[in-house]
């Protein structure tokens, strides 16, 4: 297998190209008026953006990029922040999908969630939290707390874990 392929419907191709260029640290290899293609070698990914008039909700649970260390999670978070893409929420030593992980989450221009995560070890027990870590489910409390429009003086220390 050479490449995994994801075709993502988007409502604003220009904003999406800008976002994903920053996310992947690469420019698309092909751009048309209604289409853009990123071809990444590591990880092997053929990722296309397909312009649509509307996208109704998050049609996927979430996307993720697994890295090899907590330091790499932090490096990606810092790299994206330097490019204007801020973490929506961070999870350190969180139990998710029967694994102990460090991660952070961001959203693309259409609201699709991406996580950068490092799996420290497997665990026998799954999280006691609602299953939003592995499957995206609407969480109004988390969204209000962790959204970029949330008040900067609001205490968010416990709402995003």
From Swiss-Prot:
Is Iron one of the keywords? yes
InterPro entries in the record: Cadmium-induced_rsp (IPR052393), Glyas_Bleomycin-R_OHBP_Dase (IPR029068), Glyas_Fos-R_dOase_dom (IPR004360), VOC (IPR037523), YqcK/CadI-like (IPR049789)
* EC number from the UniProt entry: 1.13.11.-
The entry's stated outcome for residue 5 to A is: Loss of catalytic activity and iron binding
Main EC class the enzyme belongs to: oxidoreductase
Q: What else is known?
A: Organoarsenicals are used as herbicides, pesticides, antimicrobial growth promoters, and chemical warfare agents. Arsenic is the most widespread environmental toxin and is classified as a Group 1 human carcinogen.
Function statement = Nonheme iron-dependent dioxygenase that can break carbon-arsenic bonds, playing a role in the detoxification of environmental organoarsenical compounds. Catalyzes the oxygen-dependent demethylation of highly toxic methylarsonous acid (MAs(III)) to arsenite, which can then be exported out of the cell. Can also cleave the C-As bond in several trivalent aromatic arsenicals, including roxarsone (III), nitarsone (III) and (4-aminophenyl)arsonous acid.
Q: What is this protein called?
A: Trivalent organoarsenical cleaving enzyme
- In its UniProt entry, the species of origin is given as Bacillus sp. (strain MD1)
């Amino acid at each position: 297998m050479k490449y995994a392929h994801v075709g993502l419907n988007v409502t604003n191709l220009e904003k999406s190209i800008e976002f994903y260029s920053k996310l992947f640290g690469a420019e698309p290899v092909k751009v048309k008026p209604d289409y853009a293609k990123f071809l990444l070698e590591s990880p092997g990914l053929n990722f296309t953006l397909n312009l649509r008039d509307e996208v109704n909700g998050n049609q996927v649970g979430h996307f993720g990029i697994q890295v090899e260390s907590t330091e790499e999670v932090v490096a990606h978070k810092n790299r994206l922040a330097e490019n204007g893409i801020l973490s929506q929420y961070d999870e350190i030593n969180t139990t998710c999908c029967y694994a102990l992980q460090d991660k952070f989450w961001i959203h693309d221009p259409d609201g699709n969630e991406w996580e950068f995560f490092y799996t420290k070890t497997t665990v026998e027990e799954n999280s006691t939290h609602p299953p939003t870590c592995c499957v995206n489910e609407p969480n109004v409390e988390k969204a209000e707390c962790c959204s970029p429009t949330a008040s900067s003086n609001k205490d968010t220390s416990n709402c995003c874990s």
